[in-house]
């Protein structure tokens, strides 16, 4: 009898550790040391390990591609109805940034989509977080209708200042990328606690380093010892990394510049969006980029 009690206690403890990302203002997900279907990759930022020519960035392991990359570079999403029109507009603006320079497409989910991104502010986690890559565990992320949702929490406070950049950062996590400042060749001025999961270094044996360190990446935190930057646009290496990870070279990609800061979205009221359609994006100044 006691053996059964101990067994189920350990099982419950293990489940709570697997399904609950570590706390932080951006996200949490550790890379599992062993291949496990039930254990989602977790951490604040990084990408997948890719056997290709030298690129910049850091990514997840090749064995995770099949289950954690989004097929055909297409991410179905569902944005909770509790967000205001302005908040929803900021989220959609961040999604549109990927369309400009990569083959990745975010679209409203359909009833036939088995996997999709769910954005909600009520998850029992800190402010803003995202899982790394598409989640596939029905045990942890299954819904009542048999679907599997990859969760992103966006508290409204995350959207107040540099909201567009914050959402772009979190969407990079959703695509499979980790933090740039957690590389072993990062700026030596970066300081912090080694016990903090968003400061620790990811070993090259457990993650894929896509070329050299890039302090301008949208996946890089701002630190007091390093010149502060407001990031609401992709660096050239961010663009290369996404296109490499999702094999965009053989697809048509827009040539709009992404290294120029976009128009602020924090003071502009967005219209109510029923569908994420290109014609709506092009007709609304909230989503326009400066192209000169």
UniProtKB/Swiss-Prot annotation:
The UniProt note on the cofactor reads as follows: Binds 1 zinc ion per subunit.
Which residues are annotated as active site? 170
> What are the UniProt keywords, alphabetically?
Disulfide bond, Hydrolase, Metal-binding, Metalloprotease, Protease, Secreted, Signal, Zinc, Zymogen
* EC code: 3.4.24.-
One GO cellular-component annotation of the UniProt record comes to: extracellular region
Q: Name one GO biological process term.
A: proteolysis
Q: Where is the signal peptide?
A: 1-16
Which PANTHER family does the protein's record reference? DISCOIDIN, CUB, EGF, LAMININ , AND ZINC METALLOPROTEASE DOMAIN CONTAINING (PTHR10127), METALLOENDOPEPTIDASE-RELATED (PTHR10127:SF795)
Q: What is the protein named?
A: Zinc metalloproteinase nas-3
Q: Which organism is it from?
A: Caenorhabditis elegans
Q: Which gene encodes it?
A: nas-3
């Amino acid at each position: 009898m006691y053996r059964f009690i101990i067994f189920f206690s350990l099982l419950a403890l293990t489940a709570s550790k697997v399904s609950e990302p570590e706390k932080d203002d951006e996200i949490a997900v550790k890379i599992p040391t062993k291949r496990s279907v039930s254990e989602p990759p977790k951490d604040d930022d990084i990408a997948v390990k890719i056997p290709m020519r030298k690129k910049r960035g850091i990514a997840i392991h090749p064995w995770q591609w099949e289950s954690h990359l989004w097929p055909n570079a297409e991410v179905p999403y569902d944005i909770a109805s509790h967000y205001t029109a302005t908040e929803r507009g900021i989220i959609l603006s961040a999604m549109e940034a990927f369309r400009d320079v990569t083959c990745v497409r975010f679209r409203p989910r359909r009833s036939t989509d088995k996997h999709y991104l769910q954005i909600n502010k009520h998850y029992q986690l800190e402010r803003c977080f995202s899982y790394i890559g598409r989640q596939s565990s029905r045990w942890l992320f299954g819904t009542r209708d048999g679907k599997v949702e990859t969760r992103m929490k966006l508290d409204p406070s995350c959207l107040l200042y540099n909201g567009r950049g914050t959402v772009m950062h979190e969407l990079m996590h959703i695509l499979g990328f980790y933090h740039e400042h957690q590389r072993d060749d990062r700026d030596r001025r970066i300081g912090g606690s080694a016990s903090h999961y968003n400061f620790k270094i990811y070993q090259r044996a457990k993650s894929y380093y896509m070329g050299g360190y890039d302090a301008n990446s949208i996946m890089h935190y701002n630190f007091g010892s390093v010149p502060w930057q407001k990031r609401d646009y992709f660096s050239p290496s961010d663009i290369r990394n996404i296109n490499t990870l999702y094999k965009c070279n053989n697809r048509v990609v827009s040539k709009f510049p992404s290294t120029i800061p976009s128009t602020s979205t924090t003071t502009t009221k967005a219209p109510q969006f029923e569908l994420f359609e290109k014609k709506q994006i092009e007709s609304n100044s909230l989503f326009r980029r400066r192209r000169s």
